[in-house]
Amino acid sequence: MVESLSLLEGSWIIKGTDFPMWASKKRKNPMITYKKISNNPTKFLDTVKYETKSKSKQIDGIDTYSTTKFIWRGKGILKVLKSEWSILVLTERILVIRFERSLVTPAGIDILVRDNVEVDDPKQFILESLKDGILKKEEIECLIWL
C-alpha cells in the first residue's frame, strides 16, 4: 500500500457520502486535498474545503499512515481531535474511504473523484468503477450523491 500512496496526492471532490456533515447539504462543494509532507511517503497534509451560505471554510489536519489505516490529527484548535480512516479504493480517478467513529463524528464512507476528472453522472461512473464487494449493497443504498 505504501507504494501506491503517491496516488493520494492532489485534490478530490466528494461525490457520494453518508457523512452527516456533507449529507445535510448545508455545506456545499466539499473537497479534500492531500499533500505529501517532506520526503515522508506516509504523512500528508489534509485540507478539507467547503462552502456555506455565507463563506468558504477550511479544516486542516495531518494524516499519518500506519500499517492498514491513516490516523488524522487536527491542526490548530482542532489538534485535540483525531480520527482513523482507511482506503478502500485508490486509482488515478477514484478514491473511496471508510472512516471510523470518533469523539465527534460517526463512522462513514466518502466516495471521491479526482478534481480534474469530468464526470457527467458521478453515481453511475463510480458504481461502474467499484470492484464487486468493495461496498455492501446497504452501504451503497445509504449514500447521498452530491
Language model regions located:
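A beta-rich soluble binding module of mature secreted/lumenal proteins
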Residues: M1-L146
